[in-house]
Amino acid sequence: VFTSFFYTTSEYYTLLKDTFLIHYILNSSIILIAVLFLTFLFGVLSAYFVSFYNFPGVNFFKWALILSFAVPAYIYAYSLTAFFENFGTLFAIITWLFGEGNYNKFIPKFDGMIGAILSMSFSLFGYVYVLTRASFYHQSNNLIEVSKNLGFSAKESFFKIILPSARPAIVAGLSLVAMECLSDFGTVSFFSVSTLTTGIYNSWLSFDDLNTANQLSFFLLLIILALFFIENYSRGGAKYHQSSQGF
């Protein structure tokens, strides 16, 4: 993959560069950024609530949230579409509750890029949840006690103490999410969204152009490396250490 850019480009790559390549890169970037944001939101918040709060069913949710791994993103895609489509599952439920009516115009439609983003987010946030929850579990209780002694509210403790301490775990989870997201083909194909993965698939299997497929894969690696560089630059020289004493 890394040496493919030194090879002579094919006619198909030239055609792709003049037509759809920018579109592929743009779609992949939008989906990646949106999925990273949602998985960060779902994963960190769910890990925080099950780690620091005691509510009915908390022990159940500690393990149930891991089950997002069990369902591939394209299965979420099919289920999401079937539930919200015209005369779909949600329509049947509303009709059963309130009788016949034109409810389709009130039911939101999750298709295209929005559907792909939601499906991948529901499937992949488990990476962030598992690693962040493990980090929260091993955080020293002294940090929390110090924040309380300093008069921090729960919100201030979360943003100033808990979240920064869990940064390495969160970044590791988001890195896995990014690689899974960019390599996904089934979900984006289901929603008819063209990404770099679509270009790789078409280049290799439809046009038998392995070199172009490798060159497109190189773009994916560049995006991942750029994310690592940005994270490392924003972290500066900060180092993170965790006590083995958890809650």
Which residues does each predicted region cover?
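Residue-level marker of regulatory loop/turn positions in helix-turn-helix DNA-binding domains and
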Residues: 110, 155, 193
